[in-house]
């Protein structure tokens, strides 16, 4: 079978040979991968010898490598470079993959062997890493229904398969709604207030869509965000805002209202089947937070700390709007970004657009890579021999301080059809250390949706896009520095409420003058970014910080409201949502809008009962970065400690243990309040 997935890659560093993969290779490779893993599992269960760590736990850890190889590419490309044919394959294979996973996690003979090893764990003289793998394997089975009766196991399978199909449907509906919307502008008058970069991008989109002489605004962030921030046309802002915030609740085939209800109820049923009172308790048992009480404590503590300042922020924006528009002007959600931007300019004379010329993408990239070199001694070398999945993508070899090969890094910066919105880091190959001691190094990718270059201008980033770059690059470092024996605990395979610490700590550098001075130069003149402009960035950093915090808290409360339910939901999704986040809302709520139906993070992503983890990690990152502030932001000893104690360790120990080893104490919210100027 001449299928690239089913033979050695013969590429540099064993990288994915994207150019050899054809659409028709996926299905046979997935089916063969499932067959091979079934065989590997049968070898474990059919082993006549007494179960040991070696012949059961380790053998299970190594099973399924072929399947993992093909599904990794399939599901990564579904996000980064999809097409109808790929979506059809995913839709076709998802139920089979779900059933395959369930067959393993509900395999009684396999569980009996795992349990036999688990029950004698005290006498096995395992290393801490081996012990954690054993506990993780055992828990994985129990959490997937291995201790259930036959009847309940059948129910568990049914629920899992339904969830699997519905989450895929939820995502596809949202992607299609996003891609299906266009706001076509026909006159220059309709462009009033928009910066040149947004006008150029809209003209470029119109050209791509065959609408010459027009401008097209879409619901993708690089188009939507500047329009809401700068457009002088209130009615058009309202139109776009309503289009964005009513996605997936129209009377069409992409409506997700019913799917939200089904997803929430299925997850509750699944958790209760396993003996948990609700889905949040099931999730949080494997989180740093541990219980919903701790999550609510965090959300409520922050709500109490930030609300007074957030009210002042909104009042200040409302006052400016009334000064400009008249005393009876009512500030609506589609006005907020627009007047907030005006106030920001008035207070700090900081126009995001005026910053763009200093943040040309290739220089930002050099700055971010340079930061990693300065902190950790690693270097990046582009290598065009490494295959990529789209011409936009660049591939780099990353070398450690001693010159040894560390990782492959792919960068994919710009939006295109077939690529979902947002920004993310992913792996095409994770790190592990083989039984022969060979350290198999990772291949990681950072994917963004930055404003594209135009025919006259290179890609110029906003300051928030610079932040996004640093954030995703922090995840990439977590993946690249991975140094663990077992793939399932490597890199970003950590508790969800810990995974954002390595990414968010990097964002702190964005407002450090010493860092900005290393790369921020005007793309035409080469003039370094003026110091007073940097000072204004620093001053503006906390602008509207409390309002932004309440917005994140609103998503956290919404998430917890859906997943702490102990009875079936049969109500009105929109009304329930508005009730859930009522205490966080400082602007009029609109009847027709709905977040839940497009809230991929908590409905189809990995953040169900986990959205609080962004704030949790913010508390951690502020607390951790205070060490860098004390020792000097480029201090290599601090960086080495962060790498050794946190970035390289993956999920090999409880995150609080790792954190305290780096920090010397448990985190508090004080550093975050101080950073945000709340205290």
Predicted regions, residues:
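C-terminal, non-catalytic "cap/extension" segments appended to globular domains
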Residues: 1-28, 32, 193, 214, ...
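N-terminal helix-rich structural modules
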Residues: 1-194, 628
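Short pre-active-site segment immediately N-terminal to the catalytic Zn-binding motif
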Residues: 451-470
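Short, glycine-/Ser/Thr-/acidic-enriched flexible segments
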Residues: 222-224, 270, 401-403, 413-417, ...
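Active-site-proximal, well-structured secondary-structure segments within enzyme catalytic domains
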Residues: 133-134, 162-165, 172, 176-218, ...
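Intrinsically disordered or highly flexible coil/loop and linker segments, enriched in small
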Residues: 35, 39, 43-50, 66-83, ...
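Short His/Asp/Glu-rich catalytic/ion-coordination signatures at enzyme active sites or charged loops
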Residues: 10-25, 74-93, 116-158, 218-258, ...
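Short, hydrophobic/amphipathic alpha-helical patches that form generic packing surfaces
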Residues: 65-76, 139, 242, 336-344, ...
């Amino acid at each position: 079978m001449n299928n690239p997935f089913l033979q050695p890659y013969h590429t540099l560093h064993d990288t994915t040979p994207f150019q050899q993969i054809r659409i028709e290779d996926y299905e046979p490779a997935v089916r063969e991968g499932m067959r091979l893993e079934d065989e590997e599992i049968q070898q474990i269960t059919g082993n006549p010898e007494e179960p040991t760590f070696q012949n059961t736990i380790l053998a299970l850890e190594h099973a399924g490598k072929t399947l993992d190889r093909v599904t990794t590419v399939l599901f990564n490309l579904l996000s980064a470079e999809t097409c109808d044919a790929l979506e059809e394959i995913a839709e076709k294979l998802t139920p089979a993959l779900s059933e395959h996973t369930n067959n393993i996690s509900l395999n009684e003979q396999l569980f009996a062997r795992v349990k036999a090893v688990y029950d004698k764990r005290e006498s096995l003289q395992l290393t801490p890493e081996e012990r954690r793998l054993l506990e993780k394997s055992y828990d994985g089975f129990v959490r997937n229904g291995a201790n259930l009766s036959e009847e309940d196991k059948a129910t568990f399978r049914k629920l899992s398969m339904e969830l699997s199909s519905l989450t895929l449907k939820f995502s596809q509906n949202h992607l299609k709604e996003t891609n299906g919307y266009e706001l076509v502008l026909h006159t220059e008058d309709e462009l009033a207030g928009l910066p040149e970069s947004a006008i150029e991008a809209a003209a470029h989109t119109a050209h791509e869509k065959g609408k010459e002489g027009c401008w097209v605004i879409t619901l993708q962030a690089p188009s939507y965000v500047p329009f809401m921030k700068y457009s002088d046309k209130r009615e058009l802002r309202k139109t776009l805002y309503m289009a964005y915030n009513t996605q997936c609740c129209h009377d069409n085939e992409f409506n997700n209202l019913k799917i939200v209800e089904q997803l929430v109820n299925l997850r509750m049923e699944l958790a209760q089947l396993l003996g948990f009172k609700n889905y949040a308790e099931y999730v949080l048992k494997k989180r740093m937070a541990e219980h919903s009480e701790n999550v609510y404590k965090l959300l409520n503590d922050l709500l109490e700390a930030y609300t007074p300042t957030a009210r002042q922020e909104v009042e200040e924006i409302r006052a400016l709007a009334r000064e400009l528009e008249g005393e009876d002007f009512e500030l609506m959600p589609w006005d907020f970004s627009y007047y907030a931007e005006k106030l920001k300019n008035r207070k700090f004379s900081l126009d995001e657009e005026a910053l763009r010329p200093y943040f040309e993408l290739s220089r930002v990239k050099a700055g971010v890579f340079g930061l990693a070199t300065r902190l950790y001694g690693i270097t990046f070398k582009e290598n065009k021999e490494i295959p990529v999945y789209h011409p936009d993508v660049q591939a780099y070899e990353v070398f450690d301080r001693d010159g040894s090969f560390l990782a492959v890094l792919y960068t994919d910066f710009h939006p295109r059809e077939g690529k979902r919105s947002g920004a993310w880091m992913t792996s095409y190959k994770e790190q592990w250390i083989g039984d022969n001691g060979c350290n198999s190094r990772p291949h990681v990718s950072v994917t963004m949706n930055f404003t594209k270059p135009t025919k006259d201008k290179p890609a110029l980033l906003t300051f928030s896009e610079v932040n996004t770059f640093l954030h995703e690059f922090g995840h990439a470092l977590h993946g690249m520095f991975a140094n663990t024996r077992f793939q399932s605990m490597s890199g970003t395979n950590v508790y969800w409420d810990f995974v954002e610490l390595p990414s968010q700590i990097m964002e702190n550098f964005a407002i450090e003058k010493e860092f900005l001075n290393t790369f921020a130069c005007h793309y035409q003149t080469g003039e370094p970014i003026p110091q007073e402009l940097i000072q204004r960035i620093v001053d503006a950093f906390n602008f509207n910080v409390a309002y932004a915090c309440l917005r994140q808290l609103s998503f956290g409360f919404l998430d917890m409201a859906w997943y702490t339910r102990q009875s079936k939901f049969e109500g009105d999704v929109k009304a329930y949502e508005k009730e859930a986040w009522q205490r966080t809302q400082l602007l009029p709520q609109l009847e027709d809008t709905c977040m839940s139906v497009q809230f991929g993070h908590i409905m189809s992503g990995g953040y169900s009962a986990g959205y609080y983890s962004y704030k949790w990690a913010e508390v951690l990152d502020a607390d951790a970065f205070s060490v860098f502030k004390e020792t000097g932001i480029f201090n290599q000893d601090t960086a080495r400690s962060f790498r050794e104690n946190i970035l390289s360790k993956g999920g090999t120990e409880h995150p609080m243990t790792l954190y305290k080893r780096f920090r010397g104490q448990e985190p508090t919210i004080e550093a975050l309040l101080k950073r945000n100027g709340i205290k």
